[in-house]
Amino acid sequence: MAKQWEVVIGLETHAQLSTQSKIFSGTATQFGAAPNTQASPVDLALPGTLPVMNRGAVERAIQFGLAIGATVAPRSIFARKNYFYPDLPKGYQISQYEIPVVQGGQVTIQVPANEKAGKEAYEKVVNLTRAHLEEDAGKSLHEDFAGMTGIDLNRAGTPLLEIVTEPEMRSAAEAVAYAKTLHTLVTWLGICDGNMQEGSFRCDANVSVRPVGQAEFGTRAEIKNLNSFRFLEEAIQYEVRRQIELIEDGGTVVQETRLYDPDKRETRSMRSKEDAHDYRYFPDPDLMPLVIDAAWIERVKAEMTELPVAIQQRFVSQYGLTPYDANVLTSSKAMAAYYEAVVSKVGPANAKVAANWLMGEVSSQLNREGLDIAENPVSSAQLALLLQRIADGTISNKIAKEIFLAIWEEKATDESAADRIIEAKGLKQISDTGALEAIIDEVLAANPKSVEEFRAGKEKAFNALIGQAMKATKGKANPAQVNELLKKKLS
């Protein structure tokens, strides 16, 4: 019998904090500036310069700690992480090691169903080890210099919050669900813009495998700088296969840092993985301990908005949504606000229908055109009226989709756009029993073979007759009434 393997994953996520200036200097942090135009003497580590802590970076770390139910350390220490790299001008990185600013905490994730693997959607709590403040390094530029490497120090000193999980995730799907939930949280709080293409939110995945039932962890490999959810999933899936095949072929997994090549969809070795002692951490003598008192924490807490998890719980309890649906609808503040605006008009009784429309037709159209919910040309009031017309029987769901696209394409600004289009195009649903009976009689007369097959026990024939009735009315017949009248006439 083949050995069964368990996957063990921990993530380290670097969230660039959305401050106007760097963590230890007053230099701007704007992305895309010309190389080395946003690098001050402090960032360049020129002699005689001293770092000064950015209060805004600390407050963003406090917000995050409060949001995940962590302990915000009353006293934390900055340390020097010593290593050589051309884009690290000081020869060390200012980080936190022994006492981080945020300790513990947890994030609840919703893992989607996987029909191919026969797995249902489920909820899981991922515990965090810590989150600490540190400065980013510069950037090495290889493309524009033949045989040479250019150094851009604009990014050096940009504030980061490194968020570290316990090694508790057991699949690539769980890791992606966690990363997406974390991304939603930091953007919701406004502490990070979450732009993965610009490197504002990037993940390192620590991956190992072990035989099922074994308590001891296997040797891990760290995959660096994964800046998309797809790359994160593909990199973990490849690395798991690589390690299992290596072990089963008699080899040994080496502790190392690896990079993911998205073109080849594989990881490759970058360097041997360092341990903490290799960095020779010691307290930074230029920075006093960071002291955060209870009053400061309370001030930050008072300014925070309702968190996604609280809104999710409210959506489940008030509107009867599933935890997964509630999670999708709180993927951004704009999405949650749009949904609540629709529900406020259609009422809690139609909250599930509103959720289905937002996650289905609306999201599909947004994805097709590469738009965010905030750029949706169909307002919440317009969608609400459309859903009300489905609820009161004026139109069918199928016709509603046509009207939605019409509102979208004409970029209508009037709240009553749905009613206007229904009237102009004559799209009102046919609910008159007499009219429907006449149409159904014609359909039955024109399709004797389907009638015979249905009476012989073939259910598909009944669906075919419904389809013919809907076709005869150009989709305007009330489907429920058609179903009922057909059954009555065929009984």
Curated annotation (Swiss-Prot):
<dbReference type="GO" id="GO:0005524">
    <property type="term" value="F:ATP binding"/>
</dbReference>
<protein>
    <recommendedName>
        <fullName>Aspartyl/glutamyl-tRNA(Asn/Gln) amidotransferase subunit B</fullName>
        <ecNumber>6.3.5.-</ecNumber>
    </recommendedName>
</protein>
<dbReference type="GO" id="GO:0070681">
    <property type="term" value="P:glutaminyl-tRNAGln biosynthesis via transamidation"/>
</dbReference>
<dbReference type="Pfam" id="PF02637">
    <property type="entry name" value="GatB_Yqey"/>
</dbReference>
<dbReference type="GO" id="GO:0006412">
    <property type="term" value="P:translation"/>
</dbReference>
<keyword id="KW-0547">Nucleotide-binding</keyword>
<dbReference type="GO" id="GO:0050566">
    <property type="term" value="F:asparaginyl-tRNA synthase (glutamine-hydrolyzing) activity"/>
</dbReference>
<keyword id="KW-0648">Protein biosynthesis</keyword>
<dbReference type="InterPro" id="IPR018027">
    <property type="entry name" value="Asn/Gln_amidotransferase"/>
</dbReference>
<dbReference type="InterPro" id="IPR023168">
    <property type="entry name" value="GatB_Yqey_C_2"/>
</dbReference>
<comment type="similarity">
    <text>Belongs to the GatB/GatE family. GatB subfamily.</text>
</comment>
<comment type="function">
    <text>Allows the formation of correctly charged Asn-tRNA(Asn) or Gln-tRNA(Gln) through the transamidation of misacylated Asp-tRNA(Asn) or Glu-tRNA(Gln) in organisms which lack either or both of asparaginyl-tRNA or glutaminyl-tRNA synthetases. The reaction takes place in the presence of glutamine and ATP through an activated phospho-Asp-tRNA(Asn) or phospho-Glu-tRNA(Gln).</text>
</comment>
<dbReference type="InterPro" id="IPR006075">
    <property type="entry name" value="Asn/Gln-tRNA_Trfase_suB/E_cat"/>
</dbReference>
<dbReference type="GO" id="GO:0050567">
    <property type="term" value="F:glutaminyl-tRNA synthase (glutamine-hydrolyzing) activity"/>
</dbReference>
<comment type="subunit">
    <text>Heterotrimer of A, B and C subunits.</text>
</comment>
<dbReference type="InterPro" id="IPR017958">
    <property type="entry name" value="Gln-tRNA_amidoTrfase_suB_CS"/>
</dbReference>
<dbReference type="InterPro" id="IPR004413">
    <property type="entry name" value="GatB"/>
</dbReference>
<dbReference type="InterPro" id="IPR014746">
    <property type="entry name" value="Gln_synth/guanido_kin_cat_dom"/>
</dbReference>
<keyword id="KW-0436">Ligase</keyword>
<dbReference type="InterPro" id="IPR003789">
    <property type="entry name" value="Asn/Gln_tRNA_amidoTrase-B-like"/>
</dbReference>
<keyword id="KW-0067">ATP-binding</keyword>
<dbReference type="InterPro" id="IPR042114">
    <property type="entry name" value="GatB_C_1"/>
</dbReference>
<dbReference type="Pfam" id="PF02934">
    <property type="entry name" value="GatB_N"/>
</dbReference>
<dbReference type="InterPro" id="IPR017959">
    <property type="entry name" value="Asn/Gln-tRNA_amidoTrfase_suB/E"/>
</dbReference>
